[in-house]
Amino acid sequence: MQSSVNEFLTPRHIDVQVVSQTRAKITLEPLERGFGHTLGNALRRILLSSMPGCAVVEAEIDGVLHEYSAIEGVQEDVIEILLNLKGLAIKLHGRDEVTLTLAKKGSGVVTAADIQLDHDVEIINGDHVIANLADNGALNMKLKVARGRGYEPADARQSDEDESRSIGRLQLDASFSPVRRVSYVVENARVEQRTNLDKLVLDLETNGTLDPEEAIRRAATILQQQLAAFVDLKGDSEPVVEEQEDEIDPILLRPVDDLELTVRSANCLKAENIYYIGDLIQRTEVELLKTPNLGKKSLTEIKDVLASRGLSLGMRLDNWPPASLKKDDKATA
């Protein structure tokens, strides 16, 4: 069985034919018979459904309360304007959400280039038409742009709180995917005497916010990560039980300085590496009395202060110190 697996062909040649800035054809060969459709269909579905991107998810237009309105001096109705906004190719650098503004009046065409952009926002298709204005027309709007993946209907983002404040805020169904079109064909390939092999040709087009080659690379990575779980699959594997750390009373994580002890007592404790209240309550009276310069008077003071907080000496903490308590913290305590 092992020898037959080793004899499986793996692709040795990949060719990228750049058709335009947004379109490319990727050829992969040779593949075993049937693997062209297997890989082609999987990559196509991932490219169309799982690529991250940005889209307009909400719009506020001056004088508009709902999407069935019409704006004086604007050729398009609100529904047409919203449809045009879905065609914007937007790229966010370092942010997941941003609000943009657009303001224009007078006769002319309103395009994506009229949108006021922040330094970390880029619109690829600046000539994309949003609306047409007459002489008395004016269009002022705020656009909320978010990062996402795949297709997300407006209802999926709207909470009860949003519904109470939704008048004038027009929600858009968002298609975040930067991939506009994907198709593939499987052709015949030949290696030496074998003529029944596959050659996969992917034809991919994006909106310009993502390079076609990078899109293929990301899709292949997603597919690889999903299949990796099967590589080390064991039939008798036991479910992994995560160990949960017991909760610790927050007061135990506070420094001993919060106890407001006398300077003498506080210095004696720190000399014994007792920085936190959790460190202190685990010491016994006998252990503390062995501390240099700490006498019975200081011991009584410590016991009284702890008692006022419902604590005492000689307590046991099984999970001390917690993992969240860094050693470096003690140096600054």
Curated annotation (Swiss-Prot):
E.C. number(s) listed in UniProt: 2.7.7.6
Cross-referenced SUPFAM superfamilies: C-terminal domain of RNA polymerase alpha subunit, Insert subdomain of RNA polymerase alpha subunit, RBP11-like subunits of RNA polymerase
Protein's name in the database: DNA-directed RNA polymerase subunit alpha
GO BP: DNA-templated transcription
Similarity remark: Belongs to the RNA polymerase alpha chain family.
Region (Alpha C-terminal domain (alpha-CTD)): 248-333
InterPro entries: DNA-dir_RNA_pol_insert (IPR011262), DNA-dir_RNA_pol_RpoA/D/Rpb3 (IPR011263), DNA-dir_RpoA (IPR011773), RBP11-like (IPR036603), RNAP_asu_C (IPR011260), RNApol_insert_sf (IPR036643)
UniProt keyword annotations, A-Z: DNA-directed RNA polymerase, Nucleotidyltransferase, Transcription, Transferase
Function as written in the Swiss-Prot or TrEMBL entry: DNA-dependent RNA polymerase catalyzes the transcription of DNA into RNA using the four ribonucleoside triphosphates as substrates.
Species of origin: Pseudomonas aeruginosa (strain ATCC 15692 / DSM 22644 / CIP 104116 / JCM 14847 / LMG 12228 / 1C / PRS 101 / PAO1)
Catalyses which reaction(s): RNA(n) + a ribonucleoside 5'-triphosphate = RNA(n+1) + diphosphate
Note on domains (UniProt): The N-terminal domain is essential for RNAP assembly and basal transcription, whereas the C-terminal domain is involved in interaction with transcriptional regulators and with upstream promoter elements.
GO cellular component: cytoplasm; DNA-directed RNA polymerase complex
Record lineage: Bacteria, Pseudomonadati, Pseudomonadota, Gammaproteobacteria, Pseudomonadales
One GO MF term: protein dimerization activity
Gene3D superfamilies: 5' to 3' exonuclease, C-terminal subdomain, DNA-directed RNA polymerase, insert domain, RNA polymerase, RBP11-like subunit
